[in-house]
Amino acid sequence: MCQAFAVPERIAATWSEVSFLGKGWQASLDVDGNRLAFWMYGCGPVILLMHGWSSRGSRLMGFVKPLIAAGFSVAVLDAPGHGHSSGAGSSVIHAGKAALKLAGHLGDVYGVIAHSAGSTAALWALCNGLSVQRSVHVCGPSSMTTVVLEIARAHCLNDRQTAEFCVWVEAFMGVTLASIDLPALAMGLKHSGLILHDGDDRVVPVAQSRALHGAWRRSTLIETRGLGHRRILSDPHIIECAVRFMMPTDHQLEMQA
């Protein structure tokens, strides 16, 4: 059970992802003794792409070409324990710290596009020093306690075991669960945000994004159907919405909030 929370599956890149990664400028940083792999594309204000659990940065490659065409540069990272980055254990805090380290290395980061657990990691980073003009959150949990309790239920833990598991999780991450729940995460939501979620997502319920939208005054929520949790990342309309939202001359989506 602890492994299910802390050790992601390291999935291989597809052939198209290998080709995509080969076209970027690859570099790495040291984050808490682990090698953080990242790739840079384009020239302009930096957009950081953050992937989800047991995934890799190249799974968001569909956003890169349109962002470059819109005048941005793109930083694609593999979170600790994922893809080409080293490390066995990981969490949203590991990923959030990696984002902070990369942002510090790159200088100003204009925006973030984050999927699933990467969204939670981005929300935590935004509360802990990451400053952006805009961020896009795709199918992400907005409260970590909900995720941990769902894992406990899936493993049929009783109340005592669940409490012990929560204590272990907090010790592993080095922060309290309350600090990764929406009331705390909302403190970092001073900028404009776009929230995208599919109603047929069977991994993260759309209620998580609705709650995030409710707590974020400067956000827009767009709900889709039929895309699920992962296919949404390659949907042309979703990609277009995210890229248009990032463009500083296009306030259409923001004004709908």
Regions found by a protein language model. Give the residues of each.
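An N-terminal hydrophobic leader/cap segment in hydrolases
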Residues: M1-S28
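Conserved alpha/beta-hydrolase
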Residues: G57, V64-S86
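Alpha/beta-hydrolase active-site loop
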Residues: G89-Y110
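Hydrolase active-site cap/lid region
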Residues: C127-V175
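Short beta-strand/loop motif that positions the catalytic acidic residue
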Residues: G188-K190, I195-H197, D201
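Short alpha-helix in the alpha/beta-hydrolase fold that links the catalytic acid
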Residues: H191, P205-G214
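Catalytic histidine-centered segment of alpha/beta-hydrolase-like enzymes
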Residues: L227-H237
